[in-house]
């Protein structure tokens, strides 16, 4: 089986909308400061819903869109940096919530590039013939790991989830992937878990599990790899950039996307943008965007799409997709 198709999409965001004006009551900021630097106008924040809750709701919508039964899914991969717990995995919790009792399940952490890594991994499993139908979810409740006193980070992120169902098919819907990592930049975007504390160690106290970021370094890295990754994946696909109908970037910052578009010689009309409504939802941004495009009827049969992401690790990745629905 060499052909894999996306047969359905779904997404879910919490009901609570937090505007830039709301953020100005928490930290020293303003709508003008946030929107001019990031393009973000508002974000969704979870109230008593955890990462698996958002992921399961997005998954159920993708299942409905695919017109399949949960029991037909035999693989679930969840991309997340904000799991409910160290164990069990979010994927196992999602499996139970949606009734996909026949699926093997695991989580994958590649930060904001996680969904691309997960989608590529799932497609490779299907191409080997080991699995037939996979659910790939990007889901985050980043609000629980934000430093709400750091205006440089807390204004950027939001909570949300997106999902796709992929299956072996007659047409090749996942044409090519290009993935990369650079651990030397690990401290540029960082969220510690816990110190090594046990009866035999000298370590005292817990690490602060909050996101920290070197914005200047992340910006430079993001523009660089976004441009190089898009060029490489298109070239490796045997296509030209003119063949691409849409580029769906990780929705982190409008300035990053604008700089990359200029370096690629492309109009911003080529890029699908929804970060103004959701902020940076890390591993959820790309599947959330794909589902929104699907629901709006923007994706016509045969359309070619490049998805491109970048994030902590450092990690980056891009894929060329063909819409076959």
Curated annotation (Swiss-Prot):
One of its GO terms (biological process) is fatty acid biosynthetic process. It catalyses: malonyl-[ACP] + acetyl-CoA + H(+) = 3-oxobutanoyl-[ACP] + CO2 + CoA. One of its GO terms (cellular component) is cytoplasm. InterPro entries: ACP_syn_III_C, ACP_syn_III_N, FabH, Thiolase-like. Its EC number is 2.3.1.180. It is an enzyme of class 2 (transferase). The keyword Cell division does not apply. Homodimer. This is Beta-ketoacyl-[acyl-carrier-protein] synthase III.
């Amino acid at each position: 089986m060499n052909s894999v198709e996306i047969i359905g999409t779904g997404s879910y965001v919490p009901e609570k909308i937090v505007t830039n004006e709301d953020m100005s009551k928490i930290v020293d900021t303003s709508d003008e400061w946030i929107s001019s630097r990031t393009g973000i106008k508002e974000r969704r924040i979870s109230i008593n819903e955890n990462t698996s809750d958002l992921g399961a709701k997005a998954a159920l919508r993708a299942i409905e869109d695919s017109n399949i039964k949960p029991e037909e899914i035999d693989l679930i991969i969840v991309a997340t940096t904000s799991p409910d717990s160290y164990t069990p995995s979010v994927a196992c919790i999602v499996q139970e919530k949606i009734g996909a009792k026949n699926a093997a399940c695991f989580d994958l952490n590649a930060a904001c590039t996680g969904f691309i890594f997960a989608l590529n991994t799932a497609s490779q499993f299907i191409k080997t013939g080991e699995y037939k139908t996979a659910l790939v979810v990007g889901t985050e409740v980043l609000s629980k790991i934000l430093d709400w006193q750091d205006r440089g980070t807390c204004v950027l992120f939001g909570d949300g989830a997106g999902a796709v169902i992929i299956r072996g098919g007659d047409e090749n819907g996942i044409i090519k992937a290009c993935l990369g990592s650079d651990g030397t930049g690990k401290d540029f975007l960082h969220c510690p878990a816990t110190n090594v504390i046990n009866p035999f160690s000298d370590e005292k106290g817990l690490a602060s599990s909050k996101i920290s970021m070197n914005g200047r370094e992340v910006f430079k890295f993001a523009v660089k790899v976004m441009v190089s990754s898009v060029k490489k994946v298109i070239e490796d696909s045997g296509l030209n950039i003119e063949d691409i109908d849409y580029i769906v970037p990780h929705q982190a910052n409008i300035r990053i996307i604008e700089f990359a578009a200029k370096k690629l010689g492309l109009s911003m009309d080529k890029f699908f943008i929804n970060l103004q409504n959701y902020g940076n939802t890390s591993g959820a941004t790309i599947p959330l965007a794909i589902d929104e495009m699907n629901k709006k009827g923007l994706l016509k049969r045969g359309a070619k799409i490049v998805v491109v992401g970048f994030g902590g690790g450092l990690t980056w990745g891009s894929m060329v997709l063909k819409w076959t629905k």
